């Protein structure tokens, strides 16, 4: 097939991957002028859609930003803070200032104080090598906190261009669409622009002083659980409502299964509470450690679901990660799934996740 390009952004048209760059429905190829799905949504509905990107593509974009004099706005999913992190961002974007914005704040328990969460984000960012000029919490879906971020962008950009970066599924496009609505009402002000030095298109939103805000394509972090489930199950892993913590008083040698996606063994220590922050729709099953392997072997895909029976053949094996908990209130985090808060110190636990999914400890978020 001869190469067809989108008349909106110049990207090469493809009809296979709906989430990929340059996707257009096969039927559209019969038209004289072909427009990709991303530009179509942009033009007709004033909506920005995320597209998938390879690591190399994404690094090219970040290096390109490093060669500009601009403000960078980094969006993370506060429910999956570490899983939606972009490593090395500070180095890659050069000396440009960075605003850190935690999205989906509305799904965390309302009892969590906003100020405490922002301080936690600052500490975590520092440990991960990022020194943001400011930190914000928003709910892009509900429009909460957006005006505050707009004011900060105006303050810090000083007439410069603004680049919004983030992984897929962090709500980056929803965030930008909220900004557009807040600033301009319903006007169709978006144009598309080739990103300097790459073949990838960034979305350009002209600002009133001659500079622009750019939406850059998102990157998939392969260590997140979302990478290993189908679209139906992905909805379960993307909570829309406030998380309801579930507490289990466990004796040692007891196990929790989170559907069939992950497992938590309390290996040794005194009887203690373990608080699970997982999507509300995800069933949690308790069993004895000595029965845990047999339970999974017999019931994975049925009692222990998601994934369903049909997906089990392709679902990666669960890999063990053992931790000795030395501090009170420590989180065991399953990247892209949730976390278990270990309330007391001096515990030995083992966490199982699909091969490739990151599991790690951190100081308690809540």
From Swiss-Prot:
Keywords: GTP-binding, Nucleotide-binding. InterPro entries: G_CP_dom, GTP-bd, GTP-bd_ribosome_bgen_YqeH, Mito_lipid_metab_GTPase, NOA1/YqeH-like_C, P-loop_NTPase. SUPFAM superfamilies: P-loop containing nucleoside triphosphate hydrolases (SSF52540). Residues 59-222 form the CP-type G domain. GO terms for molecular function: GTP binding. One of its GO terms (biological process) is negative regulation of DNA-templated DNA replication initiation. Disruption phenotype: Essential for growth, it cannot be disrupted. In depletion experiments cells become 1.5 to 2-fold longer and nucleoid distribution is dispersed. The number of replication origins increases, suggesting an increase in chromosome replication. CDD domains: YqeH (cd01855). Belongs to the TRAFAC class YlqF/YawG GTPase family. Estimated to be present at 2000 copies per cell. Binds GTP and GDP. This is Uncharacterized protein YqeH. It comes from Bacillus subtilis (strain 168).
